[in-house]
């Protein structure tokens, strides 16, 4: 487990992973992605995919928000999917994360969509559930131009924190060194995510100190 809280896997692998974790008597959690990586599936498709993942043993659901619809001004569509996707997680005692794909958004849009998610969650769910609804920065798969970052950046995370609070923020993509992970945690994003190719390097840099980034 290497000190990691959670593994992130595709929905079709959740059942197999759950069986392996149970067999190993591990406490490792399973997270999976919904409507990955573009977030353009219909609401019904997203909910069906999420429910199947829950039934297969997923603990955390990382929905890709329909940020393209948001950019087109289809605000009610985005509000509805955030409400119903979060409600499904709430009813099954699961964590919901909403990936907003910061590399595809302007600063103003990052601010607006972070606030939108907060403003859907706060009036519709109990306060003790707020900390189970994350605003997450990135899929790590968005194609940028001119080699611009496609994951979490310090400015983007700050904007998310300032506008999503009290919902927690997850920094994903671009967190490749111990120092970067430490900076994200210091800012207030407690669970920086790094993909498989970087996690051993992070552990080596951390020297297995107390501060170890969560994978997921």
Please tell me what each predicted stretch does.
Residues 1-16, 61-79, 101, 135-149:
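Glycine-rich, proline-tolerant flexible connector loops at the mouths of alpha/beta enzymes
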Residues 11, 15-35, 75-97, 104, ...:
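Alpha-helix-loop-beta-strand connector modules within alpha/beta enzyme cores
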